[in-house]
Amino acid sequence: MVVDDLHRLASSQFKLPVAPILFTALAATIGAFLLSSLRSYILYHRKMSLFPAPNSDSAFRSFFSSKARDKFLSNAQELIRQGFSQNKFAIRLKTDFTDVLLLSPRYLPQLRTEDRLQGGPYTVQELLGYLPGFEPFRFADQMPKFIPDVILTRMNRYLSNVPASITEEVEVNLAENWTDEKDWHSVHLHGTMLGLVGQCSIRTFLGPEMCRKKRWVDLHTEYTVAVVTAVQALRKWPRALVSIVQWFHPKAKAARALLNEARAMIQPMHEQRKRDMAAGKPVPADTLTWFEEVAKGQAYDAAVVQLTMALAGLHSSTDLLCAVMLNLSEHPDVVEALRQELVQVLKREGWKQTTFSQLTLMDSVLKESQRLKPVGRAFFKRVAVDNIKLDHGVEIPKGAFVAVSNHGMWDPHNYTDPDKFDAYRFARMSDNKSSAFSTVSVEHTGFGFGKNSCPGRNYVALQLKIILAHLLLKYEWRLPDNYTPATFNNGFDLIADPFAQVLVRRRLEAPEVSLRQNT
């Protein structure tokens, strides 16, 4: 007993107090973290301050004033011109969501395989993908290879089926929306083309039943419009308040409701498809099957995947189709040349996938329209996950939001008369592989560049050519008198006149060739 008491007494004399030690360690850890964060913050802003900023503003002023943001939204073109006149390598722009380091396209060869620049985090922040109802904008960050793998390893294998299936949807849609009326009548160009592209895409993604299900076709387009307009509305609020405001904002509430409706429609189909595949039953070759094959048991939200696909391609494809049609409405001689090319090639080759790769002039018109008005003034949007050194002394700090300017597509060093629509520009280069519509290059970045260029561009090219073939051989269209279409500028975004009405009528002559696949 005595020995034990002495042992306990001796031990107690040397026992250090636990609470002060933990407090000291915690304080030291927090202090080190804060010092490290402060150091990173200072280094980041020091590096970013080296670049010209044509619409710069202090953090304090930008919180209470929208002046810098408004300059960006209304006149990004002039800001970019001013910036690159001061520094031809890189500039800093205060956009409507953060500061962006905008690089010259000369850096594309260096950036094409750069793994320290990641696209997912940029999209999440720019398009508010962290909010409920906006999940399609964060899907690519959570599962970055999922959709590209499905497109490259599954969907592209079935492109030979596309001409026959899509032509059915084009016929149905145009008969309903453009009608067979042979007198001139007015239609809303963007609205009718959005529905047409959406129906054709759904036919490829989900098959004939869903693409004729009006509520899904409407929801498919309604959600993409609702969520994009919600993003635009919420970005007008201070960033710190967005997570609160979104619960009450009507546009954000509409996006959430539409996503929930999409889940109610897609989830039962997804569950049934999984059961059929597990039982070894025959299943259609569509995205429900392909995503399940690629997922290999990994959980995912099937409705979010479908809407992510829609957001990735629906608006950009529709916008390009509208741009082409507006350009052609001002060049009737090109319309006639396109018709002649179609008749000649279709008579020789028939209505099949390989035929459409031989439409040299149509390729040129699509590529030239995309060059003259891409979907944005910037692309290759990324976040730097580490410090990156580029040529000519340009250093990208860790955490920087980075994009590449598209001004190479309007550079007179790359193109003669770059501001002019030249339908034959790329047709004259047809012996050059880079002249094909779906080919990317440093000079033409309509589909991006490098390993992360659009994986679905071959499908997009085929889909748009099929639609144009129907429009050219079956219809005439023109602009109303005294109407000049205008490109809508909104920050980096460039949108073919979303308000344009066109006058259309069914051609008096029947199509000179069949727009159906020979059986």
Swiss-Prot record:
InterPro entries, per database record: Cyt_P450, Cyt_P450_E_grp-IV, Cyt_P450_sf
Domain of life: Eukaryota
Cited Gene3D superfamilies: Cytochrome P450 (1.10.630.10)
GO molecular function annotations of the record: heme binding; iron ion binding; monooxygenase activity; oxidoreductase activity, acting on paired donors, with incorporation or reduction of molecular oxygen
Residues carrying sugar: N177, N327, N414, N432
Topology with respect to the bilayer: Single-pass membrane protein
Pfam family of the protein (one): p450
Major location category of this protein: membrane
KW Iron (keyword) present: yes
Annotated localization: Membrane
Keywords: Glycoprotein, Heme, Iron, Membrane, Metal-binding, Monooxygenase, Oxidoreductase, Transmembrane, Transmembrane helix
Membrane-crossing segments per the record: 16-36
Binding site for heme: C454
Enzyme Commission identifier(s): 1.-.-.-
Functional pathway: Mycotoxin biosynthesis
Cofactor annotation: heme
GO biological process: secondary metabolic process
Any one cellular-component term (Gene Ontology): membrane
Functional note: Cytochrome P450 monooxygenase; part of the 2 gene clusters that mediate the biosynthesis of fusicoccins, diterpene glucosides that display phytohormone-like activity and function as potent activators of plasma membrane H(+)-ATPases in plants by modifying 14-3-3 proteins and cause the plant disease constriction canker.
Family statement: Belongs to the cytochrome P450 family.
Protein name: Dideacetyl fusicoccin A C-19 hydroxylase
The organism of origin for this protein: Phomopsis amygdali (Fusicoccum amygdali)
